[in-house]
Amino acid sequence: MTLQALETIRSCDLIVLPAVSKEECYAYRIVEQVCPEIADMPLLCMPFPMIKDAQKLELAHKRIYDAMEDYLRQGLRVGMLTIGDPGIYSTYMYMHRCAADAGWEARIVSGVPSFCAVAARLGISLGEKDEEIHIIPAAYDVRESLGFHGTRIYMKSGKKLEELLWVLRESMQDKESRVHQDIYGISNCGMENEQVYCGLDELEQAKGYLTTVIVKEHVVQ
């Protein structure tokens, strides 16, 4: 996490956690390592539903925001934790838009995207020269991404990892012999239960919602 994020957390009167409890909140566990005083700060645990029904999702977001706004009306500085960067597939942006639309001052504090942390942990580059970089939410249909060249990053692939690996295996059979793919994966990057995988066979053992898969495609000369 960044120094700005750390200073912002310390300046808040209340911290919102997008989870049932602090023990189940990945973001809280990360922050606690560098900001132990968060254990003594007031917390509001508000789990976000992992659903795709737009109407139900909107109602859930409104309920969560209404709970947060009660504290804003009391004059408190409210912060919300999220893993990675708030601008990349983050639950925070729903609350940010609600607060801004209601006239509150809302600030986005940038963070370290999970796939950048994963690449650093693996010691690899995501893109060089004219290589393309594609970021794909793995919870949705990933088949269209198979035609993308360069580096493909599949985020939060845990729940659909089995399907993703099957699709990748099928695509490797269809690729030209001159096209080579390096496949990596990390579950829970930076945490005490971090696991690193190289190749599809090792990825078969991967578990956890926070699994990032990186596929680097290049042509063998």
Explain the meaning of each model-derived region.
Residues 22-24, 51, 113-116, 191-193:
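Short gly/pro/ser/thr-enriched loop/turn and capping motifs at secondary-structure boundaries
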Residues 56-65, 121-124, 147-151, 196-203:
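Short, surface-exposed amphipathic charged segments that create phosphate/polyanion-binding patches used
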Residues 87-148, 204, 218:
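Class I SAM-dependent methyltransferase SAM-binding "motif I" and its flanking Rossmann-like core
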Residues 43-45, 106, 135, 183-185:
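Conserved beta-strand scaffold positions in the cores of enzyme catalytic domains, especially
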Residues 147-221:
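A contiguous loop/helix-start segment that scaffolds small-molecule binding in enzyme catalytic cores
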Residues 48-54, 141-143, 191-193:
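A short acidic, often aromatic-flanked loop/helix-cap motif at beta-alpha or helix-coil junctions
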Residues 47, 81-83, 136, 154-156, ...:
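Short beta-strand segments
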